[in-house]
């Protein structure tokens, strides 16, 4: 078996983002475009990366003009390295606060299960499965 790298997973994730995996809220506001494909994908992308590497899920607040505009999710690996595959979605001067580690929700990540499952399956297909499985 050929080992997977973070670059392999990053490329597979980015190639798998689409309107049908975007957060419905971001999609309804017209925030998602093919020019900004990571928009509305931070939560489920962090879960998919966690599927491959484990570690911790990180969450921070998103602020613009001094007002909170939601939350942002990324990963911290067991080594302590933090990886954020969707940070580039913030193009309007948004600021993400320092994150805090949270436990992965048990079971289905409602209400985004369908989008998570679709993204996860696309990534897994592009990579030929999960390592060691």
Q: Where in this protein do the model-derived segments appear?
A:
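A structural boundary/capping signal
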Residues: 1-133
């Amino acid at each position: 078996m050929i080992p997977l790298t973070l670059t392999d997973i990053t490329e597979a994730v980015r190639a798998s983002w689409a309107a049908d995996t975007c957060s419905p809220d971001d999609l309804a506001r017209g925030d998602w475009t093919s020019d900004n494909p990571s928009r509305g994908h931070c939560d489920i992308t962090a879960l998919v990366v966690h599927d491959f590497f484990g570690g911790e899920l990180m969450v921070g607040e998103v602020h613009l003009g001094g007002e909170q505009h939601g939350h942002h999710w990324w990963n911290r690996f067991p080594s302590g390295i933090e990886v954020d595959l969707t940070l580039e979605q913030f193009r309007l001067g948004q600021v993400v606060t320092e994150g805090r580690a949270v436990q992965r929700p048990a079971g289905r990540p409602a209400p985004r299960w369908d989008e998570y499952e679709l993204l996860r399956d696309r990534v897994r297909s592009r990579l030929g499965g999960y390592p060691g499985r």
